[in-house]
From Swiss-Prot:
Protein name as catalogued: Aspartyl/glutamyl-tRNA(Asn/Gln) amidotransferase subunit B
EC number, UniProt record: 6.3.5.-
Catalytic reaction annotation: L-glutamyl-tRNA(Gln) + L-glutamine + ATP + H2O = L-glutaminyl-tRNA(Gln) + L-glutamate + ADP + phosphate + H(+); L-aspartyl-tRNA(Asn) + L-glutamine + ATP + H2O = L-asparaginyl-tRNA(Asn) + L-glutamate + ADP + phosphate + 2 H(+)
Protein purpose: Allows the formation of correctly charged Asn-tRNA(Asn) or Gln-tRNA(Gln) through the transamidation of misacylated Asp-tRNA(Asn) or Glu-tRNA(Gln) in organisms which lack either or both of asparaginyl-tRNA or glutaminyl-tRNA synthetases. The reaction takes place in the presence of glutamine and ATP through an activated phospho-Asp-tRNA(Asn) or phospho-Glu-tRNA(Gln).
NCBIfam families, per the entry: gatB (TIGR00133), PRK05477.1-2 (NF004012), PRK05477.1-4 (NF004014), PRK05477.1-5 (NF004015)
Length: 481
């Protein structure tokens, strides 16, 4: 819980979130126009219905309904058997019809939750999930405004939480977890930079211990988790300062200026009656039966939380490794392919350490890696069957990234095969001990740390190719004689 110290009293922050998630589908919610709008030329992905041409009627995209139900199930929601579409009436240049089709009275899903494991398993209640149209995009340039309708009519899921957050850290965990789930079930790509996931934050403050909520302000269209946190923190402090100075906090809609780090009013906040909601006469209500809900439920993949639990149970992974490997779908697929052929801990160690280290340096994702899961399996094969040592394997791994060649070919071309000939290693060990006779005496007098020095000298002579287990055994044997 975030407490803001004041002169009159201490203040508690109360936060609710409305997340707008763009539905992954090929066509828009009520038209056949393409949703591939991000890099498209302005006004090229537009159907007549999207720009409200007279006589054009909406045709519901069933797949968007399917995606919304899938999301509701993944977020532990109740899927409503009856839901319907309404018109939200307001004027704005990028909304050509003068109304947005949404679900005000009968949303598709209600009563869900997300559990915040890093905050004592706190449950954040999800009030509702409803489908609605996105608006177009206004582009302001000097003294003119241009409208791009490519985005108009794209399906959004609005995921509305209850005002259960009491800190920006809780907000951040919720958004990360929500985005992770949406990506896993492939209902939204979660790309905040491209606007696929946008967040509105409702912020108010109240005296600590008070049961009465304060007047809230809504901060619109936040497109990164960092900006969400900054905007909420600024707005909460602004409200506290106003109340401490005897001012009245009014209900406003705000924008967050990322340059100044401040919020600014764009309009006085409207209430629901200002939008004159009424049922859309051009769309039938949705009646969803148990059979359809079960069909959607059966299509859900294993969720990240379930994967993490399985990784800790089946592979004995640490919570840290299980968290990392289960938090991204592509990473989880990669890990499971490798763990199917090799020890899970060994696979996790190489992926979270060696692989991620190189990916981070290159600034690429696991899907862009030149080393596939099959390549890593082959490399681990060479370690397990003692063809190469772990140290040499790291060198081979680097060469795999650079050349794209198989590990076996690299080992062959560079002569990196591990030396496991006992007689040859015995000769090298004998030579190392003879050349370090004084240190051998020190070792036998109790300076046992020198054992590692002897191992290092042998590895140096063999350019790291000696079998380390055999080297340890032979050195121990010769020192005891």
């Amino acid at each position: 819980m975030t407490i803001i110290k004041g002169n009159r009293c201490d203040w508690e922050v109360v936060i609710g979130l409305e997340v707008h998630a763009q539905v992954i589908s090929n066509s828009k919610l009520f038209s056949g126009a393409s949703t591939k709008t991000y890099d498209a030329l302005p006004n090229t992905q537009v159907a007549l219905f999207d720009v409200a041409m007279p006589g054009m009627l909406p045709v519901l995209n069933e797949y968007c309904v399917y995606q919304a139900i899938k999301t509701g199930i993944a977020l532990s929601c109740k899927i409503n058997k009856y839901s319907a579409f309404d018109r939200k009436n307001y004027f704005y240049p990028d909304l050509p019809s003068g109304y947005q089709i949404t679900q005000f009275y009968y949303p598709i899903a209600t009563e869900g939750k997300i559990v915040l494991e890093d905050h004592d398993m706190k449950e954040i209640r999800i009030a509702r999930i409803h489908l609605e149209q996105d608006a177009g995009k206004s582009i302001h340039e000097f003294d003119k405004t241009y409208i791009d309708f490519n985005r108009a009519g794209v399906a959004l899921m609005e995921i509305v939480s209850e005002p259960d957050f009491r800190s920006i850290e809780e907000v951040a965990e919720y958004l990360k977890k929500l985005r992770m789930i949406l990506r896993f079930i492939e209902t939204c790509d979660g790309d905040m930079e491209k606007g696929s996931l946008r967040c509105d934050a409702n912020v108010s403050v109240k005296p600590v211990g008070s049961s009465e909520l304060g007047i809230r302000s809504e901060i619109k269209n936040l497109n990164s988790i960092r900006y969400v946190m900054q905007a909420i923190e600024y707005e909460a402090n602004r409200q506290v300062n106003a109340l401490e100075n005897g001012e009245i906090v009014t209900q406003n809609t705000l924008l967050f200026d990322v340059t100044s780090g401040q919020t600014r009013v764009i309009r006085t906040k409207e209430d629901a009656h200002d939008y004159r909601y009424f049922p859309d006469p051009d769309l039938f209500p949705l009646k969803i039966d148990d059979q359809y809900i079960d069909h959607v439920r059966s299509s859900l993949p294993e969720l990240p939380m379930q994967k993490r639990e399985r990784y800790t149970n089946d592979f004995s992974l640490s919570k840290y490794d299980a968290d990392i490997l289960s938090s991204d779908k592509d990473v989880a697929i990669y890990f499971e392919k490798v763990a199917e052929k090799h020890d899970g801990k060994l696979a996790a160690s190489w992926i979270t350490g060696e692989l991620f280290g190189r990916l981070n340096r290159l600034g690429i994702t696991i899907g862009e890696s030149s080393v596939t899961a099959e390549d890593l399996i082959q490399l681990l094969d060479l370690i397990v069957n003692n063809t190469i040592s772990g140290k040499i394997a790291k060198q081979v791994f680097d060469m795999m990234f650079e050349s794209g060649k198989s590990p076996a070919l690299i080992v062959s071309e560079h002569g990196l095969k591990q030396v496991s000939d006992e007689n040859a290693l015995s000769v090298i060990v004998e030579r190392v001990l003879k050349n370090n006779a004084s240190k051998v005496v020190e070792y036998k007098q109790g300076k046992e740390k020198l054992f590692g020095y002897f191992v290092g000298q042998v590895m140096k002579e063999t350019q790291g190719k000696a079998n380390p287990d055999m080297v340890n055994s032979i050195i121990k044997q010769q020192l005891e004689n």
